[in-house]
Amino acid sequence: MTQLTIITPDDWHLHFRDGDMLQETVPATARLFNRAIVMPNLLPPVTDAKLASAYRERILAARPAGSTFEPLMTIFLTNNTTEQDIIDAKAAGVVAAKLYPAGATTNSDAAVKALDALFPIFEAMEKHGLLLLVHGEVTESHIDIFDREALFIERYLARIVNAFPGLKVVFEHITTKDAADFVMSAADNVAATITPQHLLLNRNDLLVGGVRPHNFCLPVLKRSTHQEALRAVVATGSSKFFLGTDSAPHEKHRKESACGCAGCYSAWSALELYAQVFDDLGALDKLEGFASIHGPDFYGLPRNTGSVTLVKETWTVPSEIILPNGNPIVPFFAGEEVSWKVKTA
């Protein structure tokens, strides 16, 4: 197959950041994706309906002229979140609340420290129809970073899912066979997103031959057996798994430092890279479901009506992109060849 047309896709997990960065990140995503779930981990975090609505307006202001791109907003759960916050968020059009264990990722220090105390909030979310998006890692300092996802399932996620069967839960950016198996065996209210980097890479691509800071993300890349498990589940076409890039921009100097930031900025190549993965797996017929159907169906939103055409044509991801402030950012797969390309009119 040398050409593939799919329903216009959505990105069910990304980071736009804020301020001048929006002039880069919003157009990069809006070129192909009609909607995106926008993460709330700003400084300060987006913890309520008012902050979410204001952030949404800043994103809309950064859309390219004529764009119909729609940001889908989320709020950031803390131990101070109330049921009224959930009610107000739902009324304001917020679609989900994000659970970050404190310290799990960029700007998550304000997040949840006593997870069991949030069970009344999960009950409110179940009642009012707000989805729960989970960064599924434990964060105690003595626990090995490669074990944190599996332990989160065991300690917390299984209990949350069992306690709230009417609560839709998205296990975001899964990285392990443990997570894939958990989602596959869970009830229909549980789904997962998978990033391009976790399908394309494993921890050797981060650590062998020198540290590769632009492949560093959280949850961290795992061993190849976990990568292969993720590739296997997307190849099945299961509706429980859908596209979430976790595109997460950081300026070049913040990645290439003694204490580099976590995140891969994949917005400019994500769909094409997913196509490459599905092609490698002999499963191109499953790409449309993963990119364009399973996500809206799980969220209870209409599927998009437009289409995107990909052609089998090699191109090279730019080595750098210059941000509006003049600083460079290195995109994911910078300088690498990609075998699929979006066809432009």
UniProtKB/Swiss-Prot annotation:
Gene Ontology cellular-component annotations: cytosol
PTM sites of type N6-carboxylysine: 98
Enzyme Commission (EC) number: 3.5.2.3
GO biological process assignments: 'de novo' pyrimidine nucleobase biosynthetic process; 'de novo' UMP biosynthetic process
Pathway note: Pyrimidine metabolism; UMP biosynthesis via de novo pathway; (S)-dihydroorotate from bicarbonate: step 3/3
Family (UniProt): Belongs to the metallo-dependent hydrolases superfamily. DHOase family. Class II DHOase subfamily.
Entries under PROSITE patterns matching the protein: DIHYDROOROTASE_1, DIHYDROOROTASE_2
GO molecular function, one term: dihydroorotase activity
InterPro entries: Amidohydro-rel (IPR006680), DHOdimr (IPR004721), Dihydroorotase_CS (IPR002195), Metal_Hydrolase (IPR032466)
Active-site residues from the entry: 246
Protein name: Dihydroorotase
Role this protein plays: Catalyzes the reversible cyclization of carbamoyl aspartate to dihydroorotate.
The entry's keywords: Hydrolase, Metal-binding, Pyrimidine biosynthesis, Zinc
Cofactor (UniProt): Zn(2+)
Positions annotated to bind substrate: 15-17, 41, 135, 218, 250, 262
Cofactor binding, per record: Binds 2 Zn(2+) ions per subunit.
Source taxon at top rank: Bacteria
Binding locations of Zn(2+) 2: 98, 135, 173
Catalysed conversion reaction: (S)-dihydroorotate + H2O = N-carbamoyl-L-aspartate + H(+)
Binding site for Zn(2+) 1: 13, 15, 98, 246
Enzyme class: hydrolase
Assembly description: Homodimer.
